[in-house]
Amino acid sequence: MLPSDVDSRRYVIAYFIGSPQDLPPDFLIHTPPDDFQAGLFLPGDQPDWLGRRRYPPRVLSLVGSELRISTHPSAGQPCQQVPLEHLVYIESGCILLLGWLRFVACDFEQTFPYSTVYRHAVDRFLRRLRARWLAPEDRVQDLPSFDPAQLQDVKFGNALARELDADEVPRAGLFQAPSQLVRRSWFRRWKYRTPADLLVTTPRRLLWLTDRDKGIAASYGTIARYAPHRNIKSLVWETAGQECALRIELLAGKHWRVPIKPEYREAARRLESRYAETSARTVEAGR
């Protein structure tokens, strides 16, 4: 526990909160001990030369079956409560020193930045949250296991190993490897890499790992998005000329869009078959 006589606006580290006694006292959070599951303190942004901060310190807490988001009282913002059953998907990104958590619910969406130096605390909180939010589904249990060793990509192999929980076994999967391409201009010639994508089905969720950041490949880092199977409505094929994408329709009108290269379309179709009860359809662009 950090010293109680320190203003938490001065804290610069993120830390896991294992009990209500570890909550920053100046947040004035009153939670029944029996309902508290876990918490995460995220420090505020460092002030600029005028003393302004882009965002205040926050505490994310798992209380019963709710995700609660509390900001420092000086910000004057009310506590937000998101029932886990309303949570559609989670995004967790780590690129160099920039990390962020994004929670997307039926009527709520918010992003929380942090330094990846403290990623271990964030991962620990997410594991607790997933244990309450995700439940195994029988229809996925009988799928053949997906061997991460077949990825032949160290970055994505490590990212998958770090993302999976202790009792979570990857099942059907699709890895879309990066490609090395060359661009030319009048006086220049340079190589660049296309983004890579890994879609994995586990008994508890559909997981999308990518290094696709704002349309380009992030050399140092990955982004994870995942949702429980009950939140997946359908997989929709989108085509426009030679381009193809797998659109994953989620509850509350949310979706993911995964561009698929021609050489990976058959593998993507096999993954789509896991959701055969939700009819996939080809959607021509512009229709």
What positions do the PLM features span?
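Intrinsic disorder/low-complexity detector
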Residues: M1-G64, I90, I95-L198, P203-R204, ...
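N-terminal beta-strand/beta-hairpin edge segment
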Residues: S65-A75
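N-terminal glycine/threonine-rich, aromatic-flanked beta-hairpin/loop signature
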Residues: I69, L209-D211
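Short coil/turn segments at secondary-structure boundaries
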Residues: S74-P78, P113
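Short acidic-glycine-tyrosine-enriched beta hairpin
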Residues: P83
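Active-site-flanking segments in enzyme catalytic domains
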Residues: L87
